Amino acid sequence: MRRNIIISLALVLMASCQEFQPVFTGDYDDPAGYEKVELQPTHTIAQLADMYVNGKPWTIDEEIIIKGVVSTTDKPGNFYKSFYIQDETGGMEIKIGKNGLYNDYKPGQTVYIKCNGLTLGMYGFKSGNYGGNGMVQLGYSDPTGEYETSYIEVPLIIDTHIIRGEIGDELVPEVITEADLPGTNATLETCPYIGKLVTLKGLKYANETFTLLYLDSNKDKKASWNRIFLSDKTLGITTWAMSESKMKEYITSGIWDSCTVGSGSDNFGKVGSLKGDGSYPTIEKAAYSVSQYFKMGNKEIQIRTSGFSKFADTEIDPEVLAGNKTIDVTGILTLYQGSVQFILLDIDGVKVNE
């Protein structure tokens, strides 16, 4: 069946521009043992997040220490150069410019962060009728100005600011209901589940996907000329994401032959014509993030998965896709432009209800 896919600008504005990247998921040598460290936190995670002012990243110039427990791992490949910590008040992403963070920051491990000199910013805020809050992050200042925070790259800065403490039991996810989900302008003060490891039960497939393609992923990922969006109920994507090989499989199948780009970008209305070698003009065959949409009651949940994750090409149960079965999911609850997003740690975070 030939398909024309017209994507409204409103849908485009819901897309994330900070995309997943490849993650090393092999094994490193065991790290050196941890010294027992106990620092006195001055602020909770929510108190630190509350110090952020929209649109104004802050390079912290106060002696602030926060304490949290690591809730994520990048070993399955669905997190890139960052991990989340949480306390009783909420969770926060810590951006560190290195792969294989699971080797140093283990789920259940206590981490103290000396915030002076680091930068507090938000990813995913948008004003206006179709906007809302994003996620407050802790990282380093971005000299390019492209994002409010960048990665902490220098090993000395990492070691003197991110202090590893005791390794304890892994966190038990909190089971939350539709009523607990964050609203458009939610903060940790109004929704302490943001950034935390949680379980959502009884999600029903919403029969919609969202896929972002780049013409050149090495160039400006915010530029309209470099971004193509596919969002429709008939794209035929039945996996959680797409690896490079799966992406090529979809392209060569011809299922997207008549896709009309409608992203409000420089490519609006243009149709990619499949070439004899099984490629589209200018579109990369690389791994990208895919969002599969589910419903929790009346609330839409966007589950984002990296094409570099180990479970990217895992098929979603056909009975789930058909709407005959629901799923329970465990992962990190986030916001992007006021919309609820969800990031799985691994495929074990998906349970099909019989």
Enumerate the language-model features and the residues they cover.
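Positively charged n-region of N-terminal signal peptides that target proteins for export
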Residues: 1-4, 18-19
